[in-house]
Amino acid sequence: MPLRAPGFWASGYRCTTCREVADAQAERNQLIALERHRASVLQALVQSCGTVEPVDYVALGYVETFFLYSALVAANAGWDDDRISPIDSHPGQLGATPDLTEHVYKTLHGAGIISPAPSSDPRAFSISDVDGSVDFSLRKVSWRLAPDVTGRSMSEVFALLLARLDDPEPEAVTQLWFMIAESECRKYFLKQCERYTYIKSDVYTVKVMDTVRSCLAHLSIGQMWNIIFYVLKDLAALSQEKTYARQHVYNMIPGNIRRYVDHRIGNDRPIHPWRRPSPATESWMSSILLDKVLGEGDSAFEELTGQSVGPSIGFRWRADGD
């Protein structure tokens, strides 16, 4: 008779049939526990959320309108009437980085436009043992849209959002441009970090982000990609020479970005913009902003700067008015 591990005999199951019965019972117990958790979540949601307040979608600000329209488009088949599937199940990227995608959903949730759907996978929720409050995973929960205050259907609300985007506000569009442009630059920065494997991705610090945003006032997204490419390329070479400690090289990134930009602009040297990525790799927010709101496509990526976005909207408005 073959030797068995001590735990085999201690378990009490000495044949295949017994083990199968035990496994089936364990699976049933898990399902029962899951159903109990779902019931607890539903009860806690009802107590904490109550009824969903209607929203006046006509009165939404331009940024909120853009956020909601982009979220619905990115959800694609995951949007059905007043339900939006979990972020992690969406086929494309809403924002260029996960941070931007989550910012959009947090903003919409904070404004009462969307709320967690009780029909979500119960494993997306957790209940506090202290006060019974409900917490949830932003990326794994399903969402429900608040009803329209005038009773519009969700397809009518979507048409309303679409029409609203065609009447852009220069200040709001400038805010969106900086937000999306910085996110696209962060994505490109992290991609270059993967190329130079000895540069850690977490070197994109708050200082680097602030520097990039400052430079974007004078540069297009494509031009900023050019700067990022050469800054990281030179610092990667410097890191390999081992002249400086690696952390010191990382700390040089914000200053080097500023110096590269100042040197090019100060000496009237052109900064050739990198080309816009293909639609297959671009985020939905970037595509909607560049193609629909700004209406300039590739040239908006390669030429528009933070300072020129607002005036370009005003020029379009005057041209359309004529």
For the regions a protein language model found, what residue spans apply to each?
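Cysteine-rich micro-motifs
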Residues: 6-23
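Basic, alpha-helical nucleic-acid-binding regions used in initiation and control of genome expression
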Residues: 7-10, 27-322
